[in-house]
């Protein structure tokens, strides 16, 4: 199984596009700035609420994004030899347009809690170490895993995959 982080690896960063669209610099913060992902998401949701932004604003930003140069060709090539899984800290509620552009690989990510008017009230993390847990689960049922990502929070799961191959 070939496992990839999505944003920064195959696609641009969604929150950077939200920052560009809204002019709100705070949306550019990443886990480099706020290492705890829960704290980072709480910060982003507070920014959204204080600026009266909802899920449609994020979806509009995502609809403007395309895959990074070469990502589609890379995925098409690797699918000939591997099952592809996207292990991402993104959310199902706005990842769909990018999944379509990638040819609908399996996406393992989080969910948002959205009310009827489109306001984001919270989020549901699958697990605090979901990427690492997914790799370990695949390995526990006999799969060899390759993994790639672009950020500090990818180190645990990419090193777990590398350990298995050595």
Task: For every predicted segment, state its role.
Residues 1-111, 115-116:
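Alpha-helical substrate-recognition element adjacent to the catalytic core
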Residues 7, 121, 148:
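Short glycine-rich loop/turn motifs that provide flexible caps or phosphate-binding loops at active sites
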Residues 62, 122, 126:
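A short glycine-/small-residue-rich loop at the edge of a beta-strand within enzyme catalytic domains
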Residues 68-72, 128-135:
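Short, well-ordered alpha-helical scaffold segments within catalytic/effector domains
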Residues 130-156:
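Conserved Lys-Pro-Asp/Glu-containing loop-to-beta segment of HAD-superfamily phosphomonoesterases
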Residues 157-162:
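Conserved small/polar residues in nucleotide/adenosyl-binding loops
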